Amino acid sequence: MPQLNPHQTFANYIEGESNKLSRSVGLSIAEHPNTNQFNPMFIYGPSGCGKTHLVNAIGVQTKQLYPQKRVLYISAHLFQVQFVNAVLKNATNDFIKFYQTIDMLIVDDVQTWASADKTQETFFHIFNHLFRNGKRIILASDRPHVELNEMSDRLITRFSCGIIAELEKPNVQLCVDILNAKIRRDGLKIPAEVTQFIAETANGSVRDLEGVINSLMAYSVVYNSDIDMRLAERVIKRAVKVDDTPLTVDDILEKVSNHFKVSVSAVSSKSRKRDLVVPRQVSMYLAQKYTKMPAARIGRLVGNRDHSTVIHSCTQVENRLKI
């Protein structure tokens, strides 16, 4: 059975503008798990923004304050594997009963349940039992609940009945703070200019930040050299996929408009002319795929459209690609 990571706590979860709300709500839940406020908590954000650390911190803090509580962290994938094994062993009822005894259930990466209808149905019943009995449910996903296209509507409704908290990629200043915390914790000596350089080139991924520091430590020991800009540049090239010019929705609109020989203003207009519908849909599809921006925000930037229009456009393009 998976366990909480005791090293991922609130003490080493560095706060910034991108995670302030989520961290505050998570800490409140850990300190007051017996209230039904903010239940369930649905956290979403791109890979590497700190979701797993945050949900672990909630669980660890809860166990420290309430040792008698049964707190379980599990990935959605492992939950699904366990469920399939239970079905094969004709032990589905035992599987469900076990999860119904949990006081705080933390499920990570729930987006992996897309199209897994039986898993969704089983979790729906577990969710209802826990919720009715005042138990805590915390869910993490790489996208908003409204963009879990192949999730059942009734489960989506359950996900949204508590609090929805977005975790954005950390900005440069938060990356610097995270790096400095790790540097102090590991007893390293790294010049401020190197720290700033890493923060600016690691694409806002906490995993990348930690990976770069670990690599710097290894290189420094193996080659018996100080950690300086030269070494940092060498490590960055190997450890991080550097994106010098992040793609924006404006970039995509410009490229798509040029390809289809129409103007950006026309693509972003309210016009429903056929020669504008396709470039508009392609723009939305590429924006969702390459900017990791929520559908609602993409819609606002492409003619002030709602998230359902963006999702429909992406589906249309995906269907064409399959032909």
Question: What is the role of each PLM region?
Answer:
Residues 2-21:
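Dynamic helix-loop-helix/coil hinge segments at AAA+ ATPase domain boundaries and subdomain interfaces
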Residues 147-149, 162-174:
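Conserved AAA+ ATPase "SRH/arginine-finger" region at the nucleotide-binding site
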